[in-house]
Amino acid sequence: MTTQTITDEKLSHQVSINIPFESEKQASIACNSLSPDLILRSTELSVSCRSSDRNLICEFSGSSDRVIRVAISSVIDNLKTIIECMDEFDAKEDVIFTEA
């Protein structure tokens, strides 16, 4: 599933990130949750997200490395909130690691 894709020759910087999830459903939920976010400056940035198996794949194209860095930071902040919501609604207890 692609959330938003804009092709422009000026978008010469590109980065792709792959975020693994516990299940295919979680990756799909994350992808769908990111889809409403519109890019305000589409001439400077393109972001596309899709889920594949248990992975969320986000591809960024931008006019500069700074633009991409800010976009990635924003997506990661949004993903943090999405994951916290999934954890809360899933009702799983936190795993606490102890030394053996």
From Swiss-Prot:
Disulfide bonds: none annotated. Signal peptide: none annotated. GO terms for cellular component: chromosome, telomeric region; EKC/KEOPS complex; nucleus. InterPro entries: CTAG/Pcc1. Pfam families: Pcc1. It is found in: Nucleus; Chromosome, Telomere. GO terms for biological process: tRNA processing; tRNA threonylcarbamoyladenosine metabolic process. It comes from the Eukaryota. Keywords: Activator, Chromosome, Nucleus, Telomere, Transcription, Transcription regulation, tRNA processing. Component of the EKC/KEOPS complex composed of at least BUD32, CGI121, GON7, KAE1 and PCC1; the whole complex dimerizes. Component of the EKC/KEOPS complex that is required for the formation of a threonylcarbamoyl group on adenosine at position 37 (t(6)A37) in tRNAs that read codons beginning with adenine. The complex is probably involved in the transfer of the threonylcarbamoyl moiety of threonylcarbamoyl-AMP (TC-AMP) to the N6 group of A37. PCC1 functions as a dimerization module for the complex. The EKC/KEOPS complex also promotes both telomere uncapping and telomere elongation. The complex is required for efficient recruitment of transcriptional coactivators. Belongs to the CTAG/PCC1 family. This is EKC/KEOPS complex subunit PCC1. The lineage of its organism: Eukaryota, Fungi, Dikarya, Ascomycota, Saccharomycotina.
